[in-house]
């Protein structure tokens, strides 16, 4: 299955998602915002989430596959003051994505053309068996 990839996500967030409850993640990284911007939320919409950094993402890396429930991309204004002499106003783009855990996954192939292009991965869902 080919899907968008979110990289460099905290292992604690991934562990919490594996618990099964839907969670909202706020994204600040440009490459993650670009990857999520083209995704349409829905029951058939999946993304791959991993703690591996984008530069290190290779076939064989592990992560999780999640279902995208909602996406919101917005601009935030940031005011910065320095010693009362001047202030600087900046805008920062961020995205919030609500996801629900689907399955553990492994990367088969990585498709990344640059910082301003979405990152896609070909993944397969892995099975986890417990001896009883």
Predicted features and spans:
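Compositionally biased, charged N-terminal/linker segments
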Residues: 1-42
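Hydrophobic beta-strand residues in large extracellular and virion-surface proteins
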Residues: 4-6, 17-20, 45-49, 68, ...
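Short acidic/glycine-rich loop or secondary-structure boundary segments that cap or lie
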Residues: 14-16, 56-59
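A generic structural signal for short beta-strands and their flanking turns/coil linkers
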Residues: 23, 43-45, 62-64
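Residues lining hydrophobic/aromatic ligand-binding pockets adjacent to catalytic sites
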Residues: 34-35, 43, 75-81
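Short coil-to-beta transition motif at edge beta-strands of beta-rich domains
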Residues: 36-57
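Short beta-strand-centered aromatic/proline hotspots
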Residues: 58-75
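Contiguous surface segments at macromolecular interaction interfaces
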Residues: 63, 77-132
């Amino acid at each position: 299955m080919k899907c968008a990839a979110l990289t460099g996500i905290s292992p604690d967030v991934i562990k919490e998602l594996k618990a099964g409850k839907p969670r909202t993640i706020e994204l600040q990284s440009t490459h993650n915002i670009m990857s999520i911007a083209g995704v349409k939320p829905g029951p058939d919409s999946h993304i791959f989430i991993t703690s591996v950094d984008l530069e290190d993402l290779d076939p064989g890396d592990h992560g999780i596959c999640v279902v995208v429930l909602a996406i919101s991309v917005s601009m935030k204004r940031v005011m910065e003051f320095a010693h009362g002499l001047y202030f600087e106003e900046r805008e920062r783009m961020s995205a919030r994505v609500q996801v629900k855990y689907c399955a553990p996954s492994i990367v088969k192939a990585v498709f990344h053309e640059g910082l301003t292009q979405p990152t896609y991965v070909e993944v397969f869902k892995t099975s986890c068996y417990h001896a009883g």
